[in-house]
Amino acid sequence: MKKMIGIVLVLTLALGLAACGGGDETGGEQKPSMISVVSREEGSGTRGAFIELAGIEEKDAAGNKVDRTSEMAEISNSTSVVMATVMGNKRAIGYISLGSMNDDVKALAIDGADATVDNIKSGAYSIARPFHLATLGAASPAAADFLAFAMSAQGQAVVEESGYISAAAGGDYKPSGTAGQVRIAGSSSVTPVMEKLKEAYVGLNPSADIQIQQSDSTTGMTSAIEGICDIGMASRNLKDSELEAGLEPVVLAMDGIAVIVNRENPVSAMTLDQVRSVFIGETTDWNEIGE
């Protein structure tokens, strides 16, 4: 009897090993099955731009805009959290500022176009949006000088070096030696390039005090309206209500929105229609995504 049990166990183990090895013999990577959608929070400029550009935002019968992001989506409150979530989950898909991309995650080609600066400039990659800086009326002398640097040839060179698309060919900036404080707040997508601009600006004006507070686009615009900050950052176009409140925007740069997956996910490309279907919860399995 013991001998018979032993034989059964050996056969069971052998069959299990054969089943495990069967996938390796195909030589192909296996898709990770169920899709885990990762989205930014409401108020995020990246989310606002993404749902508009990907067709996730629609109008209802009354003409009101409706965000159809899946209720099953995992909500993240910053670019870095989205990246960390996707990096740690083979089934995940999310979206981030192209300028924040690194080798920890993989950006998908959309409609046959890779997410690159050149493809955004040519229009081949369609998921792109502006970075705005906004002040309430006339900026303070210190804030105005910082903005002058950001839009200058030197400032726009920093924008390009940081992986974004410059907004304009500005003139030469001459250091003012300003010692004033400038409070900047808003989008987590705009923050990285603003940190680079701050570093370059302070290098030219060592006595300047530039403070940057990361949150989201809506918070940044509200902070500028309420006088909590001198300059608000938004990774989307300003809303009518924000313009009516007196905000005066300027386009700092253009940026793509990269649709990202885990590096171990074999999927490398999707159509924009597939992206929409995934993020509204119609497509829920990676095996439904054909390449």
Please place each PLM-identified region on the residue numbering.
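C-terminal motif of bacterial Sec signal peptides marking the signal peptidase cleavage site
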Residues: 15-19
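Positively charged n-region of N-terminal signal peptides that target proteins for export
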Residues: 1-9
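Exported/periplasmic ABC-transporter solute-binding proteins
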Residues: 4, 20-291
